[in-house]
Design a protein with these regions (language model features):
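Catalytic machinery of carbohydrate-active enzymes
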Residues: 1-330
Length: 330
């Protein structure tokens, strides 16, 4: 079979999944060094420095618009599209594009929309999501070579993103207490506050709390009464958040988009897991550590704890996190 010369990749909607998908983008670029590789990204993500060799195409998430968007791609000469999200709408978009090769996983009624549709040979969420993505590149192979997620940032790009923000401390630790998915992934604010207090007392590092406007109230509670701890939640847009994390000495976070950004930056990080599984979404980063306390109900993947106790999270004590951070800062 002749290698394609013009490839399209439909990337995931969730920020964390998008960051993990950078591994797949890198693998495609390496496998097809002469091909144009364009990316379909959720609107709002087009400002990110994602690995590609062509154009970033932003789209609206609505199902009714997915088909129209796909139809607009029909005359652009693509020979192959990789469909990474598992949703029906993403496969529908690919089908409407009339691209000859539409490669993605079956499920959710998608088989007839894809050509070929790949049937997973494993149970859901038992392999790392990065491995699931990479398997689409070589579905005939039982073992897929692992490629780590990676964002390559130029100093010029970082400086440009930071230009509109207040001056950064010379050195800082970042805390990212948010998780859009839901509270079953969010380590308690009071625990973050205690860790921030101990870090502020025992280290010479400034501490910045990073997140979206929705995380601002949480950031205020964490920073309350602490010297050297600043709440930056809501101050930055997404590219600026990437730039901020690239300058952080270390990140403490939940299993979240920020966690996966830091993993793609290959920077030191500690992640706290709750309802999700490290087997599926741990940060693939040689400088990463994570804490996970499995309960009999783990992993449930719920947004909200069905038992209203989130023991998987609260059993990870601030002292556990402080010890890990101390080891990493030595």
């Amino acid at each position: 079979m002749t290698d394609p010369t013009k490839i399209l990749i439909r990337l995931p909607n969730w920020l964390g999944d998008l960051m993990m998908a950078t591994a797949f983008c890198r693998a495609v670029l390496e496998r097809f060094p002469e091909a144009t590789v364009d990316l379909i990204v959720r609107k709002g993500f087009e400002g990110l420095p994602l690995p590609h060799r062509g154009t970033l195409l932003p789209f609206d998430r609505e199902l009714t618009k997915a088909g129209d968007f796909g139809a607009e791609l029909a005359n652009r000469g693509y020979q192959r599209i990789y469909v990474l999200p598992p949703s029906f709408s993403s496969a529908w978009m690919a089908w409407r594009s009339r691209i000859p090769e539409r490669i993605g996983y079956s499920g959710d009624g998608r088989r007839w929309l894809l050509h070929p549709a790949i049937r997973p040979a494993w149970q859901p969420r038992t392999r790392h999501l990065v491995e699931e993505y990479l398997h689409l590149l070589s579905p005939q192979d039982s073992k897929t070579p692992l490629v780590f997620p990676q964002l390559e940032l130029s100093e010029e790009w970082v400086s440009e993103q930071l230009r509109g923000l207040p001056a950064l401390p010379k050195s800082f630790i970042a805390l990212a207490p948010g998780a859009i998915y839901g509270p079953a992934k969010q380590w308690p604010e009071v625990y973050y506050h205690e860790v921030a207090a101990q870090l502020a007392q025992k280290s010479n590092e400034s501490i910045l709390i990073l997140g979206t406007p929705a995380d601002h109230a949480s950031g205020e509670k964490i920073a309350q009464g602490l010297s050297g701890v600043e709440n930056w939640c809501g101050r930055s847009n997404l590219p600026q958040l990437v730039a901020l994390l690239s300058r952080a000495k270390l990140l403490l976070s939940n299993d979240s988009g920020s966690m996966h950004i830091m993993a793609a930056l290959q920077r030191p990080q500690l992640a706290v897991f709750g309802s999700t599984s490290p087997t599926w979404t741990r940060p693939l980063n040689p400088h990463a550590r994570f804490l996970y306390r499995a309960e009999p109900c783990s992993p449930c993947f719920d947004r909200t704890c069905q038992f209203s106790h989130t023991n998987c999270l609260i059993s990870i004590q601030p002292a556990d996190v402080v010890q890990e951070l101390a080891d990493m800062l030595e």
